[in-house]
Every structure is written in C-alpha cells, then in structure tokens.
C-alpha cells in the first residue's frame, strides 16, 4: 500500500510515519519546507514532498498513486489552512483511495454529540482569542470537516480526545457520539491516536464514520467496553 501522510513532521505525523513503515507501507510525507529536518530519522525510507499542506500543487504531487491518505487537519492561522488542505486532498486523491482525517471532539457529524461545559467554554472562548491573535481558526477546521462529510470519497474523520505522551496502550476504543459514557475519561496516548488513524486505512467499517476515540486502558474504556 502506498500512503501519503499530510502533516508528517508533527508529533502525530511522525508516529503515523513510523507505524505505516512498520506495516510495510510505502510512505510519502508532506510537511512545510522548514520542517523537513524533523523527518531526518526516516531518511531513505520515505519520500518527502516539501510545501504547505494547503498548496494544491504540493498535494497533487504527493497523493498521486496513493491508496490511502492520512491528513492532520491543523487549524493554523486565519487563511483557511485546514479547509484548503482538506479540499486539495478531496480534489486530487485517486478515486477509491481511503482518506483519513484527524480533528478534535468539537467536530460533529450528525449534531447528536453532547459536550461538557468545559469543552463548550474552551471552544467559545479560546476559539475567538486564537482567531484574533491570527494563531488558529477552529471554525475553519469545522468547515474542512463539513467538506469532507459532503464528499463522495471513502473518508473517515477521527475525532481525538485530549492527548498525552507515553507508551502505547493499544488501539483506542471509539464511539459515534461525544458524551457517550465510554469516552468519559477524555484522554488518549498520542501514539495510539496515530495507531487508530493508520489502522483505519484498512477498516472499511469506518468509511463515512466520525469515530470519537479514547485510550483503551482508561477507566471509562475499561468500565464500558464490551468487545475484546
């Protein structure tokens, strides 16, 4: 399988690169030119396409011939970075490719999610502040996911909880709606977020789903999980 990882130089991206290589995938990584050095550990093992992830010609070259595309949707700046990235992937990924996008719990597919007051306050207060500071635009990440949901591609949007570093606890558990009891712990190891993203490439049950994930060994997961 040939896989493109858009946003390969970040912490999540590097985990995905390593996990994809461990599975024997051919990997193409996209990252900003100034961040290419962060991928030096993989030199000779992956192809790197430098450039902003919302540059359409960069994405067009990177996804050519790929069976799957893993996309870190970063709401960077106030110039539609996330939606530009998503649109380029939707437009240029080969027909039939598996597309897996990462985002946070604040994204909703069907409006049935139930959010804690803390998360609602964070989005309501921090979002406008970040936008005023021209640092990030959460609304653009919402728009990016809206475009993904409306597309006829083979997409999955993985909604991550709060993240922590540490050794893998195994494949995270997931639920369709934030607010479900199994997600109550609201914490996932970053490496396991990456693991879920990579595993989703070959899990057709997740096509046209927006799974909200939580760590497999968290208290809520252990209390409510029914599967093996």
What kind of feature is each model-predicted range?
Residues 3-23:
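N-terminal Rossmann NAD(P)H-binding glycine-rich loop of SDR-like oxidoreductase domains
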Residues 65, 69-108, 143-144:
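NAD(P)-cofactor binding segment of oxidoreductase domains
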Residues 81-82, 139-140, 184-198, 209:
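Substrate-positioning beta->alpha
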Residues 109-113, 151, 165-174, 200-209:
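Glycine/proline-rich active-site loop of Rossmann-fold NAD(P)-dependent oxidoreductases
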Residues 145-166:
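Conserved beta-loop-beta element that borders a ligand/cofactor-binding pocket
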Residues 155, 200-223:
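Core catalytic loop region at the nicotinamide-binding pocket of NAD(P)H-dependent oxidoreductases
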């Amino acid at each position: 399988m040939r896989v493109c990882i858009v946003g390969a130089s970040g912490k999540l991206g590097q985990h995905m690169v390593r996990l994809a290589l461990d599975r024997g995938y051919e990997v193409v990584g996209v990252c900003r030119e100034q961040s290419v050095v962060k991928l030096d550990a993989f030199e000779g093992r992956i192809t790197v396409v430098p450039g902003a992830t919302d540059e359409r010609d960069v994405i067009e070259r990177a996804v050519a011939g790929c069976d799957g595309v893993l996309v870190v949707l970063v709401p960077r700046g106030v110039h539609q970075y996330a939606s530009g990235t998503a649109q380029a992937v939707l437009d240029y990924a080969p027909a039939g490719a598996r597309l897996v996008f990462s985002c946070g719990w604040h994204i909703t597919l069907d409006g049935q999610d139930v959010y804690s007051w803390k998360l609602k306050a964070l989005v309501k207060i921090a979002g406008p502040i970040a936008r005023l500071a021209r640092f990030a635009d959460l609304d653009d990440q919402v728009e990016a996911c809206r475009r993904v949901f409306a597309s006829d591609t083979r997409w999955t949007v993985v909604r991550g909880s709060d993240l922590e570093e540490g050794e893998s606890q195994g494949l995270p558990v997931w639920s369709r709606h934030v607010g479900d009891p199994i997600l109550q712990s609201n914490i996932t190891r970053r490496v396991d977020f990456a693991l879920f993203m990579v595993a989703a490439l070959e899990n057709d049950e997740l096509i046209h789903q927006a799974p909200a994930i939580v760590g497999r060994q968290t208290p809520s997961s252990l209390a409510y999980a029914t599967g093996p």
